[in-house]
């Protein structure tokens, strides 16, 4: 009889754990969803080969994007911030930051961002060669 009660307790604890895990998972409103999604291995970023850590750069750009929102007083703090690897211009050292559905802002890449296969960085934009797809 005691083992039956113990088994019920184990089952109840297991179910509580499963429900708690499902309810505590990230939602679309979670501000860090983009960070978590970017860290997943199944996200394929299309940055040039001379970018050594694609995910690190994407997270850095997302932070710059989020930080830039504070300079736009009219933006709602609840709007989502998004970057898209298709709109990172390594030749001109800029990227597109999207705040919510309506506001697109072009921002500068950090000066230490590689912008060419021979060690060029955005500190000297005139030496940047950008990205040639397929190379």
Curated annotation (Swiss-Prot):
Transmembrane parts of this sequence: none
GO cellular component, one term: extracellular region
Tissue: Expressed in salivary glands. Detected in host skin, at the site of natural inoculation.
Major localisation: secreted
Top-level lineage group: Eukaryota
Keywords: Glycoprotein, Secreted, Signal
Glycosylation sites (chain numbering): 22, 92, 104
Signal peptide: 1-21
Function: Salivary tick protein that downregulates host immune system by binding to both dendritic cells, and CD4(+) T cells. Specifically binds to the CD4 coreceptor on T cells. This interaction prevents the activation of the Src kinase, Lck, and its downstream substrate Zap-70, and results in deficient activation of PLCgamma1, the repression of calcium fluxes triggered by T-cell antigen receptor (TCR) ligation, and a subsequent reduction in interleukin-2 production. (Microbial infection) Protects Borrelia garinii (strains A87S and VSBP) from host complement-mediated killing.
Protein name, UniProt field: Salivary protein 15
